[in-house]
Amino acid sequence: MKYKEPFGVKLDFETGIIENAKKSVRRLSDMKGYFIDEEAWKKMVEEGDPVVYEVYAIEQEEKEGDLNFATTVLYPGKVGNEFFMTKGHYHSKIDRAEVYFALKGKGGMLLQTPEGEARFIEMEPGTIVYVPPYWAHRTINTGDKPFIFLALYPADAGHDYGTIAEKGFSKIVVEENGKVVVKDNPKWRM
């Protein structure tokens, strides 16, 4: 039997960059329809189209039993009063779980069942979040510095971004009077 070769890579805890990783960049223009204040979104895109987040992924073949891992650097910012966030997703194989480790900065994870039941878990360096099977999840930067975290997930989990792009999350995370507030999403579709 031919065994897969073990390997090690370096993670820079200051920058969130994993050596030899595949880099993906999401700009605000890549997130049309994700934020409530569409006018503020349009203005920010026209005035510079900021990078919202970067992902550095080490991926394996999509097969059962293997693991992928990735870091995300989620930049601080708001569209209107809604904090910068990742697109969010279910897993294509919805019965797959995931684990997130907060490394730097301040933020949180918004999780949701297919029926719209939602939870928000605050994250700071050292926080580990378990995402159970069947829960959609997105991370949100509620601070003023980059929020960096590491995710570990089954290589065959896949990403279903389409359901979130179409329906959204049932809750949004905004700043009101200097506080982080989780509110009902007026655009959410069951």
From Swiss-Prot:
Pathway(s) where this gene product acts: Carbohydrate degradation; glycolysis; D-glyceraldehyde 3-phosphate and glycerone phosphate from D-glucose: step 2/4
Domain of life the protein comes from: Archaea
Enzyme class: isomerase
GO cellular component terms attached to this protein's record: cytoplasm
Known catalytic reactions: alpha-D-glucose 6-phosphate = beta-D-fructose 6-phosphate
Keyword Isomerase appears in the UniProt entry: yes
Enzyme Commission number(s) from the entry: 5.3.1.9
Entry-linked Gene3D superfamilies: Jelly Rolls (2.60.120.10)
HAMAP family reported in the protein's UniProt record: G6P_isomerase_arch
Quaternary structure (record): Homodimer.
Family under the similarity heading: Belongs to the archaeal-type GPI family.
PANTHER family xref list: CUPIN TYPE-2 DOMAIN-CONTAINING PROTEIN, OXALATE-BINDING PROTEIN
Protein name listed in UniProt: Glucose-6-phosphate isomerase
Native organism: Thermococcus litoralis
